[in-house]
Amino acid sequence: RVARVHRDPFEPILVVLEAERPLAEYRKITDEILRRMPDARRHPKAAAEAVRAFLMLRIGLHTGLRQRNLRELMLCARGAAPRPERWLEQHRRGELRWDERAGAWEVYIPSVAFKNSGSSFFGKRPFRLHLPDLSSLQEQIDAYVERHRPLLLGGCGDPGTFFVKSVKATSRTASYDQTTFYEAWRLTIQRYGIFNPYTGRGAIPGLLPHGPHNVRDVLATHILKQTGSYEQASYAIQDTPDMVAQHYGRFLPQDKATLAAKVLNVVWDEA
């Protein structure tokens, strides 16, 4: 028998993409992580790993970044000077930094760091996004930077990236590579995302193991279902409307009239 090669790339998260609000569905995983957060005093390492898993998913969901950009995001702690723009451009990396004026954590990434840097989306301008202080995101970032991240490093050389591995005696580096970051994400989904009827744990029945690339599918599909706009969906994943139409067109709501009515009916709801 010949193995079927053309597998549906959306299969692992189809149960999420077919929901009316895919992002609200996927968000259940981050809620599950918070619900099962270990006590940091009794189980410091387990708590640090849970916070890291929470932030991987949350920052991925807020930014729509590709795996490499998320994995290589540098950290500039509060009170420290941000890395020069030139350094970030040369190393093709972004940085998570504290914006004192806005009172928020900001993701700053030069356009050259992106796979599609020549895309009309960027116009040679950097990507800048203030992370919203919603559902304890800022609190968890602060706790991770101050307590959990140093614990995960365990005295190993600091690679400077926001996300670091749990350093073991055999570890040569605290940096994630493409494989280890994918495995960390997949493990998070297996532990918190996939509903297990025997234990009652896990957020979503029917979900399958997957990696960080699927987050972009969730965001694009969510916006497409809510707005019917390829253009708005493209903003969420730093891409073009053509690419979104090509990849996600099948998830566009079939009943366009209902979609338009949903937008218009808001006015009557407000009255």
Protein language model regions, located:
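Basic, Lys/Arg- and aromatic-enriched nucleic-acid-binding interface segment
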Residues: E20-R68
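A short, glycine-centered helix-capping/turn motif at helix boundaries
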Residues: E49-A53, R58-E89, Q226-G228, I237-D239
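Short, basic/aromatic-rich helical patch in the C-terminal catalytic core of site-specific tyrosine
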Residues: M56, L70, P212-Q226, A233-S234, ...
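Short, polar N-cap/turn motifs at the start of nucleic acid-interacting alpha helices
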Residues: G79-A80, L208-P209, G228-G249
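Active-site/catalytic core of tyrosine-dependent DNA strand-transfer enzymes
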Residues: S117-L207
